Amino acid sequence: MGKYFGTDGVRGVANVELTPELAYRLGRTGGYVLTKHESTRPKVLIGRDTRVSGQMLENALIAGLLSIGAEVMRLGVISTPGVAYLTKTMDATAGVMISASHNPVEDNGIKFFGSDGFKLDDATELEIEGLLDEAEDTLPRPSGKELGFVHDYYEGAQKYLHMLRQTSDEDFSGIHVAIDGAHGATSSLAPRLFGDLEAEVSTIGTTPNGLNINEGVGSTHPEHLADFVLEKGADVGLSFDGDGDRLIAIDENGKIVDGDKIMFICGKYLNEIGRLKDNTIVATVMSNLGFHKTVAEHGMTALQTAVGDRYVVEEMRKNNYTLGGEQSGHIIFMDYSTTGDGMLSGVQLLQIMKATGKKLSELAAEMPVFPQRLVNIRVSDKNGAMNGPAVQAIIAEVEAEMAGNGRILVRASGTEPLVRVMAEAPTQEACDMYVERIANVVRENYALQEN
């Protein structure tokens, strides 16, 4: 990670850390780096989620892009994977998404995609950072007819939804789906998509007002959708995050089906129909031990990467793997998309339910899970906390006690000032004990307040 770019673009408190001035400079520097080799006028697509700060940052970013001569196509409110898909399929030079995903409304972020629809590599981000830190802006300043221009392309969302519909061989008639749009980017898109596929649709979290994104709703609060599924008697619940790149599902009994289970269900089905490249699923170190055991029992291989969907995608691209993802709900179907896509994951999950005739609870029950506990601690110095001798000592002590019968993972968040402490063990009581012992040491030495 660099000075400005984290694991998922540039993020911060809008108008405090991520200011319109910084957005303008990102438009100029990012636009220049991504378009400098173009022989014709570069075309850049911009989408955003529903945050109140989105329009402020969008306008500043557009001004920067226009100042280096780009044509800007404004997509309006759309999901992150929607921007990635349209960037790739419309021969755009670059795409930009303005969102802080599952973060609270005060935050926002700016994420760039290359012309291939993939997030930028580290070298490109560092080149942009170098220009941001230059004392003087010496980038080209075209004038007259060479200046850029902007126009709206709101029909891009319909083109993206059409692609999603085409990924299913089944219609979803007879399936009642409950949708939680997190008051975010999928609020209008997801009900339209699943309605077009003939599902019966009930919704919560689909009335954004600029301030309520992720507020008690969405994939980080799936318990609310679980209650709604039971209330409506739905067959399945689909909970998206603010920018629509992740999915947490709910079965008909109100039980949460996380990214690990979704990956297993989809991987098993794809393997059975001969569409899982090398029988391999790419996951991260956060995936449950139960996921790894069950994947192996079904004749598949699970590879591990660092946490972050960019690292999953990186590994997938090396060997053209077709399925990967994270426990948090980022699922990548490389046959269709270049990034995690919550709505695409939902379509694939419902297609499997329809094709197999099985309830989601039946599909999910094939993968048992080890009890797991995750605690987030807001800290003053996440790197210092990770490397502190007291923290390292308690981690070593707990791992020795586990003696291989479970695991501990302590890591710094890539997008927030948090240290995450996770444990898996044969019992929930053991999980809780191990996590609290480590978390208490982190709190005593580095905590600001617990999240």
From Swiss-Prot:
The modification Phosphoserine is found at S101. The keyword Magnesium applies. Activated by phosphorylation. The active site is at S101. Signal peptide: none annotated. It is an enzyme of class 5 (isomerase). Mg(2+) binds at S101, D241, D243, D245. Keywords: Isomerase, Magnesium, Metal-binding, Phosphoprotein. It comes from the Bacteria. GO terms for biological process: carbohydrate metabolic process; peptidoglycan biosynthetic process; UDP-N-acetylglucosamine biosynthetic process. It catalyses: alpha-D-glucosamine 1-phosphate = D-glucosamine 6-phosphate. InterPro entries: A-D-PHexomutase_a/b/a-I, A-D-PHexomutase_a/b/a-I/II/III, A-D-PHexomutase_a/b/a-II, A-D-PHexomutase_a/b/a-III, A-D-PHexomutase_C, A-D-PHexomutase_C_sf, A-D-PHexomutase_CS, Alpha-D-phosphohexomutase_SF. Binds 1 Mg(2+) ion per subunit. It holds the Pfam family PGM_PMM_II. Its EC number is 5.4.2.10. One of its GO terms (molecular function) is phosphomannomutase activity. The keyword Transcription does not apply. GO terms for cellular component: cytosol. Gene3D superfamilies: Alpha-D-Glucose-1,6-Bisphosphate, subunit A, domain 3, Alpha-D-phosphohexomutase, C-terminal domain. Catalyzes the conversion of glucosamine-6-phosphate to glucosamine-1-phosphate. Belongs to the phosphohexose mutase family. This is Phosphoglucosamine mutase.
